[in-house]
Swiss-Prot record:
Species for this entry: Caldanaerobacter subterraneus subsp. tengcongensis (strain DSM 15242 / JCM 11007 / NBRC 100824 / MB4)
GO cellular component, one term: cytosol
Pfam families: Chorismate_synt (PF01264)
E.C. code: 4.2.3.5
Region (Disordered): 85-104
The protein, known as: Chorismate synthase
Molecular-function GO terms, alphabetical: chorismate synthase activity; FMN binding
Superkingdom field: Bacteria
Amino acid sequence: MRYLTAGESHGEALIAIIEGLPSNLFIDAEFINKELERRQKGYGRGGRMAIEKDEIHIISGVRDGKTTGAPLAMEIKNRDYKNWKDKKVPPVTRPRPGHADLPGSIKYNQRDIRNILERASARETAARVAVGSVAKLLLKELNISLKSRVLEIGGAKREEKWKRLIEKAKKEGDTLGGIIEIVIEGVPVGLGSHAQWDRKLDALLAYHVMSVQGIKGVEFGLGFEAARLPGSLVHDDIYYKENEGFYRKTNNAGGIEGGMSNGNPIVIRAAMKPIPTLLRPLDSVDIATKEETKAIYERSDVTAVEAAACVLEAVCAWVIADECLKKFGGDSVEELKRNYDTYLAYVRSF
């Protein structure tokens, strides 16, 4: 499968196109809308969330509620567009440190930074949540599920501290990042491959996780902690039980060994940096005058860690769904499930 997204933060709409979905997959619009709503929630979100009510509109690829095998096109309207479409917007010339503003303007020879920031905005992730929601619907057919949780915000591990830290950052014109954990359950042995570098499952997941705006680090299982421990305390012992097959008592590998899923839950943690749009802007240089100044302030969040958890679920769901289709094949959901059940029977008998 593959997908593309299009659209800008304050444009008319966001668009997503998915190619390669099997036919006869029930597209639950209510479920997709609930996932979009999840993305909009979280303490510390900005004023934009009071304007938008993200809802999916299916354009093509679905008939009588099920996919046909044709490309699936979806649209999410930007309600804030009506506030911008007839507005004379002055050019943005003061880039924000940590954002796409300056490198994007230089790369694409743009003297108005808005031509970069509109597409670079994390608003784009609404389209990816829609795509990931479709992937989740496909994985549900195979009894594979994802969940996420926020582990830290602003360095604090206890949830009762987060609200206080967010309020403090808001008063000081600052922003906060955090750490998110994603767990994927029900993944069978053998997704991904050791045979080529670009087929390794952890590499594919890391690539997609790192593509999410604001994510600066990723680890699996023990992650960086494994570097501080001897091998005898890191690697998961292998056991066997008749009628159940091979199993582990620990999951330090995070469900992936040698670039392949090993049957354990896949455990991923991602680090999100603080949002680079600050109410108390950092030092910058005006690209038009070359004079020292302060960066532009655009309406933004104090933190979006909870929202990012939903986005990370979506991109991970896409990877697992795509790998399932690569391995098991099937032009229809029925064919995919037959192939999948045959493989699971083989694994149990190995």
